[in-house]
């Protein structure tokens, strides 16, 4: 018996809505990354983008446990000597909660062309409203 290998043309994609209000950032991000990658499907193939589209709402109400709001830093470097910029997650979540969520998911996806394709299927919104009603997304209940 041969193993099934998905073709890019045969993949059927669904749309899901995830409500992140009151849930830990890492737990929501890991499950969203798994769906974007397609690991929830029996036809998962590692070298084919077989994931679904995900809409995340209420990104501003996501929670970080413990002292992570003040101790966890978002780091970026200008590539010049002494060019490290550190911002605590409290400021990041106040100013750009969508960016904080996208960064968490991006770091859980593969690096390279396939990972960038997967990340394009993620739509993150600050509030409860989104622009994708025409796609008829299903509400996705997270496992934990």
Curated annotation (Swiss-Prot):
The gene is rplM. CDD domains: Ribosomal_L13. Gene3D superfamilies: Ribosomal protein L13. PROSITE patterns: RIBOSOMAL_L13. Coiled coil: none annotated. One of its GO terms (molecular function) is structural constituent of ribosome. This is Large ribosomal subunit protein uL13. Part of the 50S ribosomal subunit.
């Amino acid at each position: 018996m041969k193993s099934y290998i998905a073709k890019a043309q045969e993949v059927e994609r669904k749309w899901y809505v995830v409500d992140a209000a009151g849930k830990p950032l890492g737990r929501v991000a890991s499950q969203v990354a798994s769906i974007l990658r397609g690991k929830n499907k029996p036809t998962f193939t590692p070298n084919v983008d077989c994931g679904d589209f995900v809409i995340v709402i209420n990104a501003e109400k996501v929670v970080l446990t413990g002292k992570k709001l003040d101790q966890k830093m978002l780091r970026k470097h200008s590539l010049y000597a002494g060019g490290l910029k550190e911002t605590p997650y409290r400021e990041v979540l106040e100013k750009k909660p969508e960016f904080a969520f996208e960064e968490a998911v991006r770091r859980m996806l593969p690096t390279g062309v396939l990972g960038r394709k997967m990340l394009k299927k993620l739509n993150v919104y600050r509030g409860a409203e989104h622009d994708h009603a025409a796609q008829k997304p299903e509400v996705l209940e997270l496992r934990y």
